[in-house]
């Protein structure tokens, strides 16, 4: 099931279990995963996109191996909050993904996640070549960590 509201996404999840964060691009999918208690997001890898069936098979293998219980997709909103073609493409990807990988899917505003990831990599004095290799899954880590922090806050506040 696909959820626009993070509160609904949280309600659809078991109490524990790892989540994945995806930063969907036209050529790559950055993947990050959380620990089972959903405290820390760790950038995992970048999947080079080919055909949807192949991309979905790779994501399903990761989900099975990591025993994921949910997926967060970064939703690329425009700076004014509206949704353009990239957001529509992300929503279509989610609709197709749940047909192959029947896990709860939530969306998270990904505005500036790549900028934050780039800044962190620059501060770590990462070479340009290495930044290009890891930027997508580091951005996925930022997206997922934002969700984990929000889920933690909702759990403490009883807002879910």
UniProtKB/Swiss-Prot annotation:
Concerning NCBIfam families, the annotation shows: RNAse_H_YqgF (TIGR00250)
For this protein, the record's HAMAP family field holds: Nuclease_YqgF
InterPro entries the record matches: RNaseH-like_sf (IPR012337), YqgF (IPR005227), YqgF/RNaseH-like_dom (IPR006641), YqgF/RNaseH-like_dom_sf (IPR037027)
Swiss-Prot/TrEMBL keywords: Cytoplasm, Hydrolase, Nuclease, Ribosome biogenesis
Function recorded in the entry: Could be a nuclease involved in processing of the 5'-end of pre-16S rRNA.
Where found, per UniProt?
Cytoplasm
GO molecular function annotations of the record:
nuclease activity
Gene Ontology biological process:
rRNA 5'-end processing
Q: What is this protein called?
A: Putative pre-16S rRNA nuclease
- Enzyme class label: hydrolase
Q: What Gene Ontology cellular component terms go with this record?
A: cytosol
The EC number(s) this enzyme carries = 3.1.-.-
Could you say which protein family the record assigns here? Belongs to the YqgF nuclease family.
């Amino acid at each position: 099931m696909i959820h626009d509201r993070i509160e609904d996404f949280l309600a659809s999840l078991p109490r524990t279990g790892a989540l994945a964060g995806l930063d969907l691009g036209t050529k790559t999918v950055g993947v990050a995963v959380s620990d089972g208690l959903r405290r820390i997001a760790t950038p995992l890898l970048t999947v080079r996109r080919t055909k949807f069936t192949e991309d979905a098979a790779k994501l399903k293998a990761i989900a099975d191996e990591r025993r994921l219980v949910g997926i967060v997709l970064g939703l690329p909103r425009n700076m004014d909050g509206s949704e353009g073609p990239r957001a529509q493409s992300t929503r279509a990807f989610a609709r197709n993904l749940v047909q192959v990988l029947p896990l709860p899917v939530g969306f998270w505003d990904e505005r500036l996640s790549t900028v934050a990831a780039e800044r962190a990599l620059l501060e770590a004095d990462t070479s340009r070549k290495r930044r290009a290799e890891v930027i997508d899954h580091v951005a996925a880590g930022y997206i997922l960590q934002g969700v984990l922090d929000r889920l933690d806050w909702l759990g403490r506040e009883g807002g879910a």
